[in-house]
């Protein structure tokens, strides 16, 4: 099929605003945020009246910060080479504000600086605050934004707006998530809070609802009558790198499963919303979260990688990583089975797995359909045609796309049947570069669209599900490490499926 060279209606341009990044010297700013801002500028999405201010503790001049961000764009943007004209149009609107997150003077001077930016650059008083800091600072920053009148409490259609983006984790359990929400409620407006899960900004994830609800082919069989089980897998070849301090406080369940994987599960299983709006989609996602049955201890496997070889390179075990306790009991792999107690999904097992130091980097969803109920292809009538399950594979990364596997007769044979695949890939079908997740999410926030952001109700419902499991884990000492770096997974994760007569899909 020919490439599609003409795209549909373009996304709207963003209104003027000033974006303040707290923790602007961190990896997220360099690897994700500024490459996204550069690409949005290149595509004409950002207003010429957009300004970005980095807020961090390290002493740094405007010029130093700009040069560091230019290097970051060069290193991490999906654009092949930096376009000097695009960079120059953005560069003079980038500033650095050196201050401590806990000191009042830093916020007072920030307020004065933003007022001068409004006057000079025409940002119209619109403000986007981005918390790209460790979660320990969230509440302190939120309180200071309110205390120093940096956040507007009354926001109407004709008034300037202020919005807050929070990066996960949104607490480390139900209690801390509730404490964070109490701080938000006491200081700012919940409708102005955008909890970012970058998985929701990925094109294939956004496409899940379209695949389901715009195609009778899929939605008509999207239920327990036709689906045998579902697998959602996140495999990472990397270890924890320099994130030892963070990962020791989180682990894989908190870092990946409680948020990213649960969002994928909700989109995959929710009922059709009454309308395609942020509020209605969130309503259906919350219904799903509340219908997930309590997770049994025997249906969860946790693991931690030991030393091994990944893609031909010898690597250390988790306990030998930088800033990691040499006796750490933190999990780097989780597999679990859960059930949704509603008419559509009753009895269908959902298997989720996420792990580090696995053979390769991939994230996908596999919908495994039941085998045909017709008796035409049984072993007596057709000894050479054992049927495979039909599969729908939604690839989220890399090679974003969708593949459908089904059974077909082999040409030139009598009754030989083999599985074949139809494969759609974004990069080969659409003549365009798939936008990075942060490009879409930053624009949506500036435009005031909360559809792809996580609500407080979703966060709390997810923690209600996983906090009891974390409590159980705290009382049991696992035997770690229990899988070799570069292997597929711990043995117990294979047994989780094999005792049900199933197996993880190979990749």
UniProtKB/Swiss-Prot annotation:
Q: What is its EC number?
A: 1.1.1.49
Please provide the record's keywords in A-Z order.
Answer: Carbohydrate metabolism, Glucose metabolism, NADP, Oxidoreductase
Q: Which SUPFAM superfamilies match?
A: Glyceraldehyde-3-phosphate dehydrogenase-like, C-terminal domain, NAD(P)-binding Rossmann-fold domains
Q: Which reaction does it catalyse?
A: D-glucose 6-phosphate + NADP(+) = 6-phospho-D-glucono-1,5-lactone + NADPH + H(+)
Instruction: Identify which top EC class this enzyme belongs to.
Output: oxidoreductase
Q: Does the keyword Nucleotide-binding apply?
A: no
Q: Kindly provide the name given to this protein in its UniProt entry.
A: Glucose-6-phosphate 1-dehydrogenase
Q: Which organism is it from?
A: Chlamydia muridarum (strain MoPn / Nigg)
Q: Does the keyword Oxidoreductase apply?
A: yes
Q: Which GO terms describe its biological process?
A: glucose metabolic process; pentose-phosphate shunt, oxidative branch
InterPro entries, from UniProt? G6P_DH, G6P_DH_AS, G6P_DH_C, G6P_DH_NAD-bd, NAD(P)-bd_dom_sf
Q: Can you cite an annotated GO cellular component?
A: cytosol
Record-listed NADP(+) binding positions = 57, 168
Pathway, per record: Carbohydrate degradation; pentose phosphate pathway; D-ribulose 5-phosphate from D-glucose 6-phosphate (oxidative stage): step 1/3
Q: Which GO terms fall under molecular function for this chain's record?
A: glucose-6-phosphate dehydrogenase activity; NADP binding
Which PANTHER family does the record associate with it?
A: GLUCOSE-6-PHOSPHATE 1-DEHYDROGENASE, GLUCOSE-6-PHOSPHATE 1-DEHYDROGENASE G6PD
- Which family is this protein grouped under? Belongs to the glucose-6-phosphate dehydrogenase family.
